[in-house]
């Protein structure tokens, strides 16, 4: 299959990431795993998790729930984006620990945001303006929108998703700022459960490690978070955005100075695939390097396509979209794919004291501009301000966190 061959070929040029989201994964094994998760959503009744977060009676200190001297104000679970919030909170005076199941590093593929959105990290205190400049690898304008069969002209705008940000630099700089301020990072920590006591939450981070005590747990583990899956149970999402794409070298340099925010090049697809939309951005890795995404919105009925089959459609349609002869005319650097489930009751309301979902875990992502970094940036000042206030007032019960 073409999709498998190209994914495998790209692995030498890209480290496989673990985050699920737009461009969040690159390996053939990750494609199989994501399609399995998507299949479980479509089939229903197979995606829930039981007992990961539990209510426990009494105080943690009297129940063997970790060493009181190691207590934190906030435990951030999921560090790739969580470290951004952690850095802001730590620099505001909270005692914060970041728990990451793998190595806390950013992926190779650039994130596209606006400079104004990136500035929100500076305003929140997560990083300096010099850090933001260092992380911005490329900027471009104009940004276009256009639709297949339309007799009108393209809609042209500027300064929307027009900055390519290096995740590797962004995560590294926020981590450095976080740790400089006294924050603690736990890498390769296997979070196995959360027990919520009257006075603290206790996090089990695997055999041979002391439990972590925190007044508040921030779940930044994405839509596949075990806490999110426990709360949502086996409920199907109300809608899903599936996305596939690649970063490739060899596009005409003279046409690689602007971007597409949204474009269509075909009518609605048959076989329950919906309407294919496209995005394209110049990449900083070279003057002929370009990232293209193809995405579609749909429900989670069993008849909907696999992500692998959408990737096959991508290989067929991308040359038409980019006005090149064949996909073989460019050299693949990374193949990208992800999905975003959406629910009518988002943002997700917590079912537990001392546990709050943020980022994609909360369901606040926007499928048009995708989730991940952009979704978090738009809310980071509100999140950090609200968490700081909740800690100051000790308003950490379920009802308070739902406000």
Where are these regions (language model features)?
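Glycine-rich FAD pyrophosphate-binding loop
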Residues: 75, 79, 87-109
